[in-house]
Amino acid sequence: MAFSESGEIRTVARFDKVVEAPNWMRTTGELVYNSGGPIYAWKDGVERRIDTGVCDCCNNDHVLSPNEDAIAVSHMTFDSGFTSRVYIMPFDGGEPRLVTPNSPSFLHGWSPDGKELSYCAFREHDSRREVDVYTIPATGGEERRLTFGGFNDGPEYSPDGRQIWFNSTRSGLMQVWRMNRDGSDPVQMSRNDNNCWFGHISPDGKKVVYIVYHRDHLMPNEHLPNMQCELWLMDADGNHPRRLCSLFGGQGTINVNSWSPDSRLFAFVSYEWE
């Protein structure tokens, strides 16, 4: 589905399977999503599977490189408990390269300069498991923790690469925040009475779309599937927030940035009970 700022909802495809988290390709106009583990690309009714090699259990946290010649995915394994690690591979197929040996790691952003990835990670600190925003060189290396306190998720870069948008419970409810790329100067951008997740900045840097769960339906640190939720839009300075629509969805609806290149539309997924 796609939603325009003017309020028009257009259904572009219906599936008899669960699809999640579309990315909108600038170069081909395809929508890239995960379904049942593999990654697919879709356009004009034609679906093709992307060759992700051994990464055949991808969750809904995947992004394209700035020039779209590569894709980074969060690949899950269950041999030693639940794990998720970030891999990069050529978009036209090839051997995946491990980027984050530590797990669980859930990818959300690729910097515009192509040098860095941002992700949410569960890590042990002082005998406590904390959930924070991290960055790591796209070539691999040492990860860097950017957030401290609260439950922090959904980090993605601003179009100019200077800032990172993320969501955090540090103010109580889950809200959309923004900070500098090095983690400094965090600022709360949404001020909703409900829980706000996954703020996605438009390519022109002017608008942010995000998903909202009712505070009575979930804990602030939860974002589950099969929920009644809403999509909201605000200006990039946090002003003029407004509800766009209600839908049945949640996890998988809009986990990663899905804006069209011209910033007029964004893609999302809603679900139906059979």
Language model segments and positions:
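Conserved beta-propeller blade repeats
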Residues: D16-V32, D56-I71, N102-L117, G149-N167, ...
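A generic tandem-repeat structural signature
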Residues: D56-N102
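A generic fold-level signal
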Residues: S4, R26, W42, G81-T83, ...
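C-terminal closing repeat unit and adjoining cap/tail of repeat-based domains
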Residues: M227-G250, N255-E272
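Structural motif
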Residues: P38-Y40, G81-Y87, R128-D132, L173-W177, ...
